[in-house]
Amino acid sequence: SLAENLAEMLLCSLSGLEKITLKIEKPWAPVGLPLKTVSVEITRKWHTAYIAFGSNMGDKKMYIDNGIRGLAETKGCRIEAISDYLITEPYGVTDQDEFLNGVLKMRTLLTPGELLVRLHQLEQAANRERIIHWGPRTLDLDILFYDQEIIDMPDLHIPHIDLHNRDFVLVPMNQIAPYLRHPVLN
């Protein structure tokens, strides 16, 4: 819609703009009702998300770098910070190669669901195959936090389940967001 496109264009092009409320009115709209105007009002804003990334197959760094680049090139997404890459032992299924892991901080206009779809597209572009739970992967991208939201849906859990027990998440999170509080565990 006009309001959606205008809000996105303004938020993406004006660097200091964090939130916008737009009201679009059309006087004497032909809607078949005795109204002087018809209007739509929307509010859109930038959201802060933290994304865990990892790989333990092939050229791990290349897969991660390409995933981050793809995310940075996504309309309505801005990468703000990237942790160091850490070499870590596998979690869950331990009979596999070491992982290269890290975390990034981003700002996005995407909803949590839209962001999840985009992360899955980037994983698919890296030829990720979901054969074994916690098994080897070319690229793994997970939403850790999205603002301070708590979401519990079949395919999306924010904050990410069990992140507080995973050093491969906690160490890079501490590097880029040492004072961030978990919205459930505080």
How should these model regions be labeled?
Residues S1-A49:
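N-terminal, polar/charged subdomain of small-to-medium soluble alpha/beta proteins
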Residues L6, L10-L11, L71-A72, L119:
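Hydrophobic C-terminal alpha-helix "anchor/cap" residues
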Residues L6, N56, I82, P172:
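Residue-level signal for inorganic ion chemistry
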Residues E18, K36-V38, K75-A81, E98-G102, ...:
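A generic structural signal for short beta-strands and their flanking turns/coil linkers
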Residues K23-P27, Y85-I87, L144-Y146:
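Short loop/turn motifs enriched for small/polar and acidic residues
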Residues W46, Y91-F99, L110, L116, ...:
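Flexible, gly/pro- and Lys/Arg-enriched active-site loops
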Residues W46-C77, S83-I87:
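N-terminal beta1-alpha1 ligand-phosphate binding loop
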Residues A81-R107:
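Short, charge-patterned binding micro-sites
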